Regions:
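Short, glycine/charged-enriched secondary-structure capping and boundary segments
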Residues: 86-88, 113-115, 162-164
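Conserved nucleotide-cofactor-binding alpha/beta core module
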Residues: 91, 98-142
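Gly/Ser/Thr-rich loops at beta-strand to alpha-helix junctions
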Residues: 76-80, 154-156
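Membrane-anchoring hydrophobic helices of lipid-metabolizing enzymes
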Residues: 1-73, 83-85, 92-94, 112-113
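Amphipathic coiled-coil/heptad-repeat helices and related helical stalk/stem segments
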Residues: 57, 82, 130-134, 169-171
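Structural motif
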Residues: 71-73, 117, 148-150
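Membrane-associated lipid acylation/remodeling enzymes share a hydrophobic transmembrane-juxtamembrane segment
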Residues: 95, 138, 142-172
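Short, flexible loop segments at the rims of nucleotide/cofactor-binding pockets, characterized by
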Residues: 47-52, 76, 123-128, 163-164
């Protein structure tokens, strides 16, 4: 975590969980009840259901190449929402994208085809899983697909109680 003091770190995590996580879980359950679609239609419906407005100008979306290998590198200030927003924006142009994401987020059947699991370093077979991730990523790029990645590997966190979110060092 961001804090060296385990008590502070746990307190922040608890506050975040009690506020944002509960609301997010309610939204997810409501979305599931509404009939979450499989595949590419998932992204725009999820974004609308969550009440997220994407203000990226269409001329910027038009800069996304419609074909050919592409790597999208992004900061990660908002957690799950970052991947969803990028997926929705890329999906407006092409649906051959994959998001490198922690393995615990890959079990969602509706969007599993868009995920490449990134193992946690503490997993018993992390090295083997990491090699599989790399191979799958390279195969997808060689086939002309899009890879979306968050190089810090974690959500940006505040260094204090009220400060701005700061990106972690990149893990490249």
């Amino acid at each position: 975590g961001t804090f060296k003091n385990p008590l502070k770190s746990q307190t922040i995590r608890t506050i975040e969980w009690l506020t944002a996580k509960v609301q997010l879980l309610r939204l997810i359950r409501s979305f599931e009840k509404s009939g979450a679609p499989f595949g590419a239609p998932f992204w725009p419906k999820a974004i609308r259901h969550m009440g997220i407005r994407i203000d990226t100008p269409e001329d910027e979306i038009a800069r996304i190449p419609p074909t050919g290998p592409l790597v999208v590198v992004a900061n990660h200030p908002s957690g799950l929402v970052d991947g969803m927003v990028l997926a929705e924006m890329i999906n407006r142009v092409r649906s051959d994208f994959r998001i490198l994401t922690r393995s615990l987020l890959t079990g969602i059947p509706e969007v599993e085809e868009f995920m490449i699991p990134v193992p946690f370093p503490h997993e018993d077979n992390a090295r083997e899983l990491g090699l599989q991730m790399r191979d799958e990523t390279m195969r997808h790029l060689k086939a002309g697909g899009v890879i979306i990645l968050f190089p810090a590997g974690k959500v940006a966190m505040s260094e204090g109680w009220w400060g701005p979110a700061v990106e972690a060092e990149w893990n490249v």
